[in-house]
Amino acid sequence: MSFQSMASIAEAAREVAAASDLNTLEQIRLRWLGRKGVLTEAMQQLGQLSPETRREAGQLLNERKSEIQSLLQERKAELEAAAIHARLQQERLDVTLPGRREACGSAHPIRQTLEWIEHYFFGLGFETSDGPEIEDDYHNFAALNIPEDHPARAMHDTFYLDATRLLRTQTSTVQIRFLESHQPPLRMIATGRVYRRDSDITHTPMFHQVEGLLLDERASFADLRGLLSDFLHGFFAKPDLPVRFRPSYFPFTEPSAEIDIGCVICGGSGCRVCKQTGWLEVLGCGMVHPAVLAGAGVDGERFSGFAFGMGVERLTMLRYGVNDLRLFFENDLRFLKQFS
């Protein structure tokens, strides 16, 4: 093609205008501006011209290149707009359809269980209390009638920070601090994190506990039994749920008991969860030991009381049928959304 014929871009303009889609337009661009395009080959021939003609021809070719690029851009914009319009025509929105709700967060299952427990005991006149998670030896052990040679003090159970400070192993520490600042009669519960050196499918180094304490002039084990039986019936929404109290030992209560419920998984017939016994341990409780009352300055002749403690994760696992405690702490949204 001669340089004079390149002075006219009518042919390129016709091709661009006739392009009906983006693929065709791209082929036209390559034909005129590609590595082997008409304008590219013409520019490669500039070296064959005389210096006077070369300057004029080069200027002309650059002008034509700019004009063709402009035509291509305009046509591309037109074709893209037409494609969007056609797609919108095919994908008409039905404004009568319900909209999509925004993703919302929800309370963690452990938090839901804690709130249920707190609400239940608030309705019975209990107040809530809290205490430090970094405790001293006195409040975590000595004040709870746990002697120095008790197994609970062993390093395999407790996280010690130094010789006198540790991460609390139970929320019973709050019971002692509450007694130091309150006089009976009283009712309190304490919820919070506790720490023990253990980790498997049913234990984690950190877990949540609820501690309860009631002191009054005529508090009895019968009151304790009625309170916790009603609590378990309500928590599992099973008024006929079997509940039994087994004699046990805790240094800070006497007498002491552990509470079992009929297995909520198999209905008491025996399964892997209840180890074929038909029963599941869920609570520890007992009458407050006289030594604990005396250490807190409470008149044990006038006042008696009971205490109880429960692991929140275990109750939550049984309530929702979760078989691995660690799922509560892995923050997998697929798991957590089931409780929203």
Curated annotation (Swiss-Prot):
Catalytic reaction equation(s): tRNA(Phe) + L-phenylalanine + ATP = L-phenylalanyl-tRNA(Phe) + AMP + diphosphate + H(+)
Cofactor(s) annotated in UniProt: Mg(2+)
Top-level EC class: ligase
PANTHER family the record matches: PHENYLALANINE--TRNA LIGASE, MITOCHONDRIAL, PHENYLALANYL-TRNA SYNTHETASE
Matching Pfam families: Phe_tRNA-synt_N, tRNA-synt_2d
Subcellular location as annotated: Cytoplasm
Residues that hold Mg(2+) according to the record: 254
Keyword Protein biosynthesis recorded: yes
Signal peptide limits: none
A GO molecular-function descriptor: tRNA binding
Highest taxon of source: Bacteria
Subunit composition and interactions: Tetramer of two alpha and two beta subunits.
UniProt key word Magnesium: yes
Family per record: Belongs to the class-II aminoacyl-tRNA synthetase family. Phe-tRNA synthetase alpha subunit type 1 subfamily.
Protein name: Phenylalanine--tRNA ligase alpha subunit
EC number: 6.1.1.20
Cofactor note: Binds 2 magnesium ions per tetramer.
Coiled coil (residue ranges): none
Keyword tags: Aminoacyl-tRNA synthetase, ATP-binding, Cytoplasm, Ligase, Magnesium, Metal-binding, Nucleotide-binding, Protein biosynthesis
GO cellular component: cytoplasm
GO process terms (BP): phenylalanyl-tRNA aminoacylation
UniProt cross-references to InterPro entries, sorted A to Z: aa-tRNA-synth_II, aa-tRNA-synth_II/BPL/LPL, Phe-tRNA-synth_IIc_asu, Phe-tRNA_ligase_II_N, Phe_tRNA_ligase_alpha1_bac, Phenylalanyl-tRNA_Synthase, tRNA-bd_arm
